[in-house]
């Protein structure tokens, strides 16, 4: 550890926290800031004004690792030059590669894993308080927030190192989640996005069965305007959730369910626990139970051994099923995974990228047609930003950060971020709706 250890720092130091990666990481960062601020510590949004820098890293795929390492290196240079007094690194990358990072980056004062909030607070000169563990300072716009239902994952997907980074699946209690949600509601949050590494088995470890549906009903009763479900695993998904979604007006007709692939051989190699027939049957059941639902999914292409015929099978599935939202990643050969240990990364990177492009071009055409069907219709939207005479908003069918944007002429109406309004859609493209605001919803 460098000289002038920051463990004895006084409370007049300013802290900058850089949160990288997914929304689960964001929640971890919000909890750290919330607890620290509650104890009187000061944070800044400007890295150049900080005495202490904390980087919450992502280690999921190669691109995320590279971004995390680049940010650490930049901050380490500041630490080396005396521009900051301390540098701490936390999160998934730190959990997975702590020993290697310590050896390569002596400028970093301390590395922490994903469950080290008490230790981080301690080194900042304050104490962890279990009674306020859900105290959060939101990093998202104040009108929406993430509610993390669990920590870790007990699935054994061959391409994923999340269980190594975050441990086995551990649900938060319903009581704690309802308490946290109540606090978020009091902060003015209107849209609650339910997240986890996997929301499907929520409660199984605590109650012996999935309690996702029960939790949704309880959260719905708290009167959020929108409640949204993200990161649902296909295997053992509780279909009663879709019935509740259809019945409850404030639960968005939206489900994010990454299926990753459709070829039986690849699904088996991925250790997904579900085959093509089971996947299609589940998705058809979901649409049958709620015809108005919008389904988002994620695919991986270029998985080891993926033949052209297997990729064509995936294309045909997407062509026929017509997902409402779809993202695609090229396979990333990650250490600490079964695929890395047992399979050869034999698809050239150029070929992977070509397959990503081909699949996304197909989806673009599907999305264009689906959005065109919304033209001349009036939709309820949530305003995200206002700039001059334009408002940028989302429908209930679009999650924050990843889905479509709705660009609206405010028509002189006084509108602010966080407002709901009715909008008439006049034009569309694959990933954007364009229209005008009819009226603000009180």
From Swiss-Prot:
Q: Give the matching CDD domains.
A: Radical_SAM
Q: Where is the Radical SAM core domain?
A: 139-369
One of its GO biological process terms is: tRNA modification
Q: Which UniProt keywords apply?
A: 4Fe-4S, Cytoplasm, Iron, Iron-sulfur, Metal-binding, S-adenosyl-L-methionine, Transferase
| Amino-acid positions noted as binding [4Fe-4S] cluster 1 in the UniProt annotation, renumbered to this chain | 22, 58, 92
Q: Tell me where in or outside the cell this protein is found.
A: Cytoplasm
Q: Which PANTHER family match?
A: RIBOSOMAL PROTEIN S12 METHYLTHIOTRANSFERASE RIMO, RIBOSOMAL PROTEIN US12 METHYLTHIOTRANSFERASE RIMO
**Which gene carries the instructions for this protein?**
rimO
The record's family statement is: Belongs to the methylthiotransferase family. RimO subfamily.
Residues covered by the TRAM domain = 372-439
Which coenzyme or cofactor does it need?
[4Fe-4S] cluster
InterPro entries from the UniProt entry = Elp3/MiaA/NifB-like_rSAM, Methylthiotransferase, Methylthiotransferase_CS, Methylthiotransferase_N, Methylthiotransferase_N_sf, NA-bd_OB-fold, Ribosomal_uS12_MeSTrfase_RimO, rSAM
Q: What class of enzyme is it?
A: transferase
- Name the record gives this protein: Ribosomal protein uS12 methylthiotransferase RimO
Pfam families recorded: Radical_SAM (PF04055), TRAM_2 (PF18693), UPF0004 (PF00919)
SUPFAM superfamilies xref list: Radical SAM enzymes
> Which reaction(s) does its UniProt entry say it catalyses?
L-aspartate(89)-[ribosomal protein uS12]-hydrogen + (sulfur carrier)-SH + AH2 + 2 S-adenosyl-L-methionine = 3-methylsulfanyl-L-aspartate(89)-[ribosomal protein uS12]-hydrogen + (sulfur carrier)-H + 5'-deoxyadenosine + L-methionine + A + S-adenosyl-L-homocysteine + 2 H(+)
**CC per GO annotation:** cytosol
E.C. number: 2.8.4.4
GO terms, molecular function: 4 iron, 4 sulfur cluster binding; aspartic acid methylthiotransferase activity; metal ion binding; protein methylthiotransferase activity
